[in-house]
Amino acid sequence: MALVSADSRIAELLTELHQLIKQTQEERSRSEHNLVNIQKTHERMQTENKISPYYRTKLRGLYTTAKADAEAECNILRKALDKIAEIKSLLEERRIAAKIAGLYNDSEPPRKTMRRGVLMTLLQQSAMTLPLWIGKPGDKPPPLCGAIPASGDYVARPGDKVAARVKAVDGDEQWILAEVVSYSHATNKYEVDDIDEEGKERHTLSRRRVIPLPQWKANPETDPEALFQKEQLVLALYPQTTCFYRALIHAPPQRPQDDYSVLFEDTSYADGYSPPLNVAQRYVVACKEPKKK
């Protein structure tokens, strides 16, 4: 029943999102005339080679209108982003509910494990669709934006992806990509599923063994302080795997769509580090251990 309710709400939100997109285009078309007037006024001023009181007053009015138009369009876009975030949240809730209930399509019976190629594609899609933090002027990026860690009392929710420190079969410890199943306030411990085993491998871990992954990408152009910087030690997901390893930041992203360039610790190389490899913001978290000398 809850799944049906979620489906109907998602349909409503998609309709509302479509209307907001139409409003955005209408707002942009409406403001176009004013922008053309600004350009033409500047061209006349250049032709006459002077700034008369008339042009000064006219431009002040045109720019005031342009600013108001831009703010109106911005408000519509923010509403659209809120709708998208709500849709994604409902889809995630629906996925978790189906997983708990053990629901599967008749045409697709349960599989013990997901094909590795499919899993890698899903991880790439998750990184690409991670929302970009877009704050208002003066806003600071929140916790879990880029390199900014979660607050001390933060508890990851069921379905959230985390880096989890677990014991491997050989007894060694490693950081894996995992999904939160539950959290017990009585024991202060998480239950997490290894993402690579489709729930087959479940671990019970203390809070210090779980690092929540970023929930927003940081924009290098507006919030560079929310990114890890060159030579900073991190844990990064090694490409085409589901394990995190220690690495140094070689270069932070330069544009919102860019990845980090990182150097993984690797004793097979003379300097102890691999050549630069790209890792998405989604899969780079702080490493609290000291650098190797």
UniProtKB/Swiss-Prot annotation:
UniProt keyword list: Acetylation, Chromatin regulator, Coiled coil, Nucleus, Transcription, Transcription regulation
Question: What effect is documented for mutating Y238F?
Answer: Does not affect binding to H3K4me3
| Site label Histone H3K4me3 binding, positions | Y238, Y245
Location of the region described as Histone H3K4me3 N-terminus binding in the Swiss-Prot/TrEMBL record: 194-196, 240-243
For molecular function, the Gene Ontology terms on record are: histone H3K36me3 reader activity; histone H3K4me3 reader activity; methylated histone binding
Which GO cellular component terms are attached? ATAC complex; mitotic spindle; nucleoplasm; SAGA complex; SAGA-type complex
- Name its cellular compartments: Nucleus
Could you list the residue ranges forming a coiled coil in this record? Answer: 3-88
Spell out the protein name for this chain: SAGA-associated factor 29
